[in-house]
């Protein structure tokens, strides 16, 4: 093992980025799945580095986000156009969520500048695949899909202006009522289908998916579970069930050779069942679902957890601590990338690395690379 680590554990410089030798084996991978700890400063330079490398060296053009499709439309609009008003709106919608960090602003401004230098067929597109966390972001995102604004009824515009004032941290009966009426009047199926096809034009199918997402998020079983996340695994399980269906939907619409990068909370990314130390339950994670049965991406998923160390403290990555061992000790003082899935890897052999209680198989059943990120701090909230 020591010989392997000396060969494949590589210090990384965020400015210089990754190279093929450092990243290592990438054969047959189409879905690169990084696992972060939310609100940490070091996840942002890591995300830039990973995205740029995967775009330039592995042909990844799609950034999948741990956000709703509506919120994703706002970000994608910004990174294609540089519309600062939309970026500010999107950031305001992130407040109170797992993406509430001022470093989000720098990330998306960097990606806009990077994207503006790419030819049209090589530009990166951002797509939200999670549930619709923020109603306001969803509504605003839908307006970006409208191709024929002259078809929008005045009554809808009035309801929209009321509904867009909904707050996450307070209840406004009039705003909620306006939202319900608006969705009822514009739901793009049944008797409304013809009209809404005229409104959304070529974007109709995307609009239908977002409306369906809103229905999913409002279902009582799911809606109530989000208030009991310490004891009820339903919230996480349903979110990942939803995400896998969105990915399936994308695979049916994007080019057959499309490749993806996603940076999610680490809990979602592992490819094999494992216990969780924070709420001590198991569930069918997104990383596991991607490799299930006949799913089109089975065997093509590369999970890359970030082992994050705060200044002066031990790792905050609760789940990665299930795997953390003395063999990493020599590599925690600087950002380090380790490819675990090379041909001669001891991490793919049983009995070489002892897994913690509740884990079975070998380390590369769970993930294939790791990125060690020392000297992290809690990121300031969005201003």
Predicted regions and their residues:
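Compositional signal for N-terminal targeting/processing segments
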Residues: 1-383
């Amino acid at each position: 093992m020591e010989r392997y680590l000396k060969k494949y554990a590589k210090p990384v410089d965020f400015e210089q980025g990754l190279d093929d030798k450092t990243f290592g084996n990438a054969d047959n991978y189409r879905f690169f799945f990084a696992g972060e700890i939310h609100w940490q400063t070091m996840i942002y330079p890591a995300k830039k580095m990973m995205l740029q490398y995967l775009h330039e060296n592995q042909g990844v053009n799609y950034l999948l986000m741990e956000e709703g499709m509506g919120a994703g439309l706002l970000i994608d609009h910004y990174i294609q156009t540089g519309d600062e008003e939309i970026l500010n709106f999107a950031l305001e919608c992130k407040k109170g969520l797992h993406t509430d960090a001022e470093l989000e602003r720098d990330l998306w401004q960097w990606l806009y500048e990077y994207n503006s230098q790419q030819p049209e067929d090589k530009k990166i597109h951002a797509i939200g695949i999670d549930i619709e966390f923020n109603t306001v972001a969803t509504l605003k995102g839908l307006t970006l899909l409208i191709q024929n604004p002259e078809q929008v009824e005045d009554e809808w515009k009035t309801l929209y202006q009321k509904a867009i004032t909904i707050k996450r941290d307070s209840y406004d009966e009039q705003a909620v009522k306006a939202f319900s009426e608006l969705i009822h009047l514009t739901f793009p199926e049944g008797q409304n289908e013809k009209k809404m096809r005229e409104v959304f034009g070529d974007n109709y199918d995307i609009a239908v998916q977002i409306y369906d997402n809103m229905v999913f998020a409002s279902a009582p079983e799911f809606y109530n579970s989000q208030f009991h996340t310490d004891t009820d695994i339903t919230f996480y399980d349903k979110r990942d069930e939803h995400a896998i269906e969105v990915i399936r939907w994308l695979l049916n619409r994007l080019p057959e050779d499309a490749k993806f990068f996603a940076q999610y909370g680490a809990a979602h990314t592992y490819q094999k069942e494992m216990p969780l130390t924070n709420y001590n339950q198991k569930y069918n994670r997104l990383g596991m679902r991607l490799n299930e049965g006949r799913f089109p991406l089975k065997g093509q998923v590369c999970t890359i957890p970030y082992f994050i160390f705060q200044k002066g403290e031990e790792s905050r990555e609760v789940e990665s601590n299930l795997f953390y061992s003395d063999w990493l000790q020599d590599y925690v003082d600087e950002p380090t990338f380790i490819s675990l899935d090379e041909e001669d890897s001891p991490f793919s052999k049983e009995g070489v690395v002892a897994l913690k209680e509740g884990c079975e198989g070998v380390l590369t059943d769970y993930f294939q690379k790791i990125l060690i990120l020392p000297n992290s701090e809690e990121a300031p909230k969005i201003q």
